[in-house]
Amino acid sequence: MQRMFVATVLGLGLALPAHADVTLKQTTGGKGLGISGNASGATYIKGNKMRSDAVMGDKTHTTIFDVDAQKMYIFDSKKKEADVWDMATFGAELSKTVDMSGAKASVKPNGQTKQIAAHSAAGYDMEVAMQSAMGGSKDMTMTATLSGPIWIVKNAPGSADYARFYKAAVEKGWIFSDPRGAKAQPGQAKAMAEMYKQIAEIGGIPYETIVQIKMGGSGPMAGLLARMGNVTMTTTVDAVEITPLADDLFAPPAGYKLNQKK
């Protein structure tokens, strides 16, 4: 479920005015490690805030990213409480386990195009590899590799705001997955963040993203990590809307209990 949750954050949008509120509606699917079927969802961007909703059965899972306040909120529609993460502190701790000097990232045009949601999308081949230490030990390392095709619609409504948000977040060391999962797989979390940064720099919206995640490593955990690989996540944009969004959409509902996490 965490992997499906991560996938729903795969974004979408380019701007007409200098600053616009963007709503991105998408469908997410995947296979591997318990992932099956599709989930509908929406991503909302307002300045340096983003909200991601993923509908799974009769429950909606929500993550709110408030970059300026350095807070991440995670909650669902059933449980009237939200987990709150201080991302300045969490990001600093996570960075200690990830070897950024050995990171490899590339998003290159492949010369292909296709129609998605009535837009012409240009094809790119993406590959990001990130190494991290397991349990703080340099003798046991884990490498997360993300690869696959991305189909980007340049100059689509909402793109500038999409890019602005992700650039601001990555500059502050943010990740875009559940921090609990990121603790176990920091390299994967950082690789995903680097992927968003690379996409944002192209200047368009990824209307379709097919990401294959492979894990590798050294030491006694190498075999287990290899079996954790071959997870594929697909996100497709169904629609992009440029409409004003209320400020309270980017905070837990009134009355929710807030649980501070570390």
Range-by-range predicted roles:
Residues 20-262:
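Extended soluble regions of mature proteins
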Residues 1-8:
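Bacterial N-terminal signal peptides that target proteins for export
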Residues 14-20:
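Sec/Tat signal peptide C-region and signal peptidase I cleavage site
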